[in-house]
Swiss-Prot record:
Allows the formation of correctly charged Asn-tRNA(Asn) or Gln-tRNA(Gln) through the transamidation of misacylated Asp-tRNA(Asn) or Glu-tRNA(Gln) in organisms which lack either or both of asparaginyl-tRNA or glutaminyl-tRNA synthetases. The reaction takes place in the presence of glutamine and ATP through an activated phospho-Asp-tRNA(Asn) or phospho-Glu-tRNA(Gln). One of its GO terms (molecular function) is glutaminyl-tRNA synthase (glutamine-hydrolyzing) activity. Its EC number is 6.3.5.-. This is Aspartyl/glutamyl-tRNA(Asn/Gln) amidotransferase subunit C. The gene is gatC. PANTHER family: GLUTAMYL-TRNA(GLN) AMIDOTRANSFERASE SUBUNIT C, MITOCHONDRIAL.
Amino acid sequence: MTKISSSDVRKVAQLARLELPEDQIETYTEQLEEILSYVDQLQEIDTKNIPPTTRAVEVVNAMRDDLVEVNCSREDLLNQAPHREGDFFRVPKIL
């Protein structure tokens, strides 16, 4: 079992830029030890006959065919722009 000290908890909190009250250091120390104990148990499981995976459930992308549809003409869209220049939208300079 991995032993966590209160100084380890303080160091992790510092690295994560967290301010932990002193009265909670012991609580977090115990909780981290429990978590690492659980991870140790997982490390002991024999997984050599289990193929590596990236997720528990296989996900398949449901793709549809792309269909070209004409909804508006270019001119109709450009006529709705507050400012236009030829066949382009004119927008304020941002840089």
